[in-house]
């Protein structure tokens, strides 16, 4: 910031009621002093119904595009140590979602005044949520886990909602010379393969092959804000559960009766919040968990009821608890990872389909990664890639592969990249030969994706699938760059139309050429030599084509088709809207003339 801007900010903040405070007049033990080294800060007292909050602004080097941080120096005595919406760690005030917010960066005075108003509103909303308990803390939704302040992270490679027996494994860095790093992975018996892939790709190894028994507890809290948080002991966790959800409290205690072992990982699935967890190690010698009988045994033998209050006191006593650690929980299971970016999650992902990708050139290279991220090859169904060509230095400018792949078969290099990119990859395989276009081969797949850009291949695929019954056909998806890189075009052949139907429409095509490009000398732009043809254009059009082809593959999962033809024009005309392409009466493929 220059001096003019500094003076402008000074005058605006003083006008808003802030006072400039030297750093030496602020406690050196405060988070503000420990984290920020400025000579002074602007501080303002905000009055709420619960009392006064003193808030300091930390101005950034670029005040026009970056909002100042708001640090709470003092809060009302009755709220200290309490969980408050929008206040993290007891001192960091999240008064706006900066990444989602928009403002006029050229009006600095208006921006600072808006920040002042927003801080006041946020503090009042936070206090109001504590005092009234609004709708189980609507102000807290999505924030709760950030106040957990854990030192460790557990990654869930299993879908913990499936009620399977879970185990948590502790892993660390393989290189002994590196700073020791520890990571926890939760899986079940069906996801051990994903666990091993996770560890391998993150260069980790198990510290102990014995897992920590893990249990998910669902919590529907009566309130969140206003409680003492975060809990520093296991007893504090039990006290909190007893206060906000007695049923969850009982389920947790039953877990210890059913599993009288030393080490436990508990995942707390709080309604409308991200999951959090904790690890607790118990001294079994100080307890008598085996003397308690599970609820099912008690029903059968008609034994006396358990004194849960006594059990809670015993299991959380200082003598019983050897270790208590708060843990962040991150979902890394297939369902969570693959469905996150889909609007219609109910239709599933591509892991439920056998898929063949023919052609691993520029379009196929980008498309392969997109299909993987949509689930292809991540389940029991296969994702096979076909290409007979090798990756060469001249391919680098438009291809997703790297210099280390030069000389390798494109399909093999792509499969290596896909398998090493995620722990979810399971059934991905490369074939270094051309795809055999025959009935036996095509019947193996649910979706066959043609990324060759070669009309004879596309036309032959469309013809051969029409020898099948409609219910037995794979869906064909053709994608290609047209107009020497000026357009992306994608066709979905689900039986309504075919590749040939597009070019049979004489209103738009003549001799296989889009009439929008009729004024261009296509051959003059191509470099042709014996056995090869190269057309110079950048990778942008291929990336767009790959993106539309991914959309086409995902649309196959939907009950009702929205389109069978889509295009994007980069140059030479207007882009047509997506449409359901009808079978053309002059199409030789559909009418058996080929």
Functional labels for PLM-detected ranges:
Residues 77-137:
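Glycine-centered motif in EGF-like
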Residues 126, 145-324, 451-594:
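Glycine-rich phosphate/adenylate-binding loop
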Residues 382-423:
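Glycine-rich phosphate-binding loop and adjoining beta1-alpha1-beta2 segment
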């Amino acid at each position: 910031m220059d001096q003019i801007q500094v003076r402008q900010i000074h005058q605006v903040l003083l006008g808003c009621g802030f006072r400039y405070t030297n750093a030496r007049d602020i406690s050196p033990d405060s988070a503000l002093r420990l984290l920020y080294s400025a000579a002074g800060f602007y501080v303002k007292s905000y009055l709420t119904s619960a009392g006064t909050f003193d808030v300091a602004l930390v101005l950034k080097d670029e005040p026009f595009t970056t909002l100042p941080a708001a640090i709470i120096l003092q809060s009302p005595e009755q709220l200290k140590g309490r969980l408050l919406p929008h206040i993290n760690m007891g001192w960091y005030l999240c008064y706006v979602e900066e990444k989602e917010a928009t403002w006029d960066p050229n009006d600095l005075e208006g921006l600072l005044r808006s920040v002042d108003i927003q801080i006041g509103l946020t503090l009042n909303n936070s206090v109001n949520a504590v005092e009234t308990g609004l709708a189980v803390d609507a102000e807290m939704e999505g924030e709760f886990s950030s106040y957990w302040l854990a030192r460790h992270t557990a990654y869930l490679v299993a879908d913990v909602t499936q009620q399977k027996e879970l185990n948590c494994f502790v892993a660390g860095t393989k290189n002994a010379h590196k700073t020791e790093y520890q990571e926890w992975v939760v899986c079940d018996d069906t996801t051990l393969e994903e666990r091993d892939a996770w560890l391998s790709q993150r260069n980790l190894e198990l510290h102990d092959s014995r897992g920590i028994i893990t249990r998910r507890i669902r919590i529907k809290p009566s309130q969140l804000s206003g409680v003492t948080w975060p809990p520093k002991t296991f007893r504090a966790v039990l006290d909190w559960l007893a206060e906000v959800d007695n049923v969850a409290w009982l389920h947790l205690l039953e877990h210890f009766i059913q599993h009288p072992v030393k080490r436990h990982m508990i995942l707390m699935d709080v309604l409308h919040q991200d999951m959090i967890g904790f690890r607790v190690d118990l001294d079994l010698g100080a307890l008598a968990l085996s003397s308690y009988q599970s609820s099912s045994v008690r029903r059968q033998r008609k034994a006396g009821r358990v004194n849960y209050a006594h059990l809670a006191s015993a299991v959380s006593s200082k003598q019983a608890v050897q270790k208590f650690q708060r843990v962040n929980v991150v979902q890394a299971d297939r369902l969570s990872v693959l469905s996150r970016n889909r609007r219609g999650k109910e239709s599933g992902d591509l892991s439920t389909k056998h898929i063949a990708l023919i052609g691993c050139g520029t379009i196929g290279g980008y498309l392969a990664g997109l299909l993987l991220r949509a689930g292809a090859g991540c389940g029991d169904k296969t994702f096979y890639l076909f290409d007979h060509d090798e990756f060469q230095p001249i391919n680098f400018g438009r291809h997703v592969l790297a210099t280390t792949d030069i000389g390798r078969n494109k399909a093999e290099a792509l499969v290596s990249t896909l398998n090493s990119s995620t722990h979810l990859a399971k059934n991905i395989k490369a074939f270094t030969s051309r795809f055999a276009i025959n009935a036996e081969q095509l019947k193996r797949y649910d979706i066959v994706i043609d990324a060759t850009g070669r009309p004879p291949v596309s036309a032959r695929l469309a013809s051969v699938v029409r020898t099948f019954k409609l219910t037995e056909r794979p869906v064909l998806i053709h994608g290609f760059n047209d107009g020497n890189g000026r357009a992306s075009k994608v066709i979905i052949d689900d039986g309504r139309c075919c590749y040939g139907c597009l070019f049979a429409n004489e209103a738009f095509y003549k001799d296989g050429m889009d009439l929008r490009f009729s004024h261009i000398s296509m051959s003059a732009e191509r470099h042709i030599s014996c056995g090869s043809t190269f057309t110079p254009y950048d990778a942008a059009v291929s990336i767009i084509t790959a993106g539309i082809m991914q959309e086409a593959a995902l649309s196959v999962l939907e009950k009702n088709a929205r389109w069978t033809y889509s295009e994007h024009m980069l140059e030479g005309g207007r882009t047509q809207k997506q449409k359901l392409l009808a079978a053309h009466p002059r199409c030789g493929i559909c009418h058996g003339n080929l």
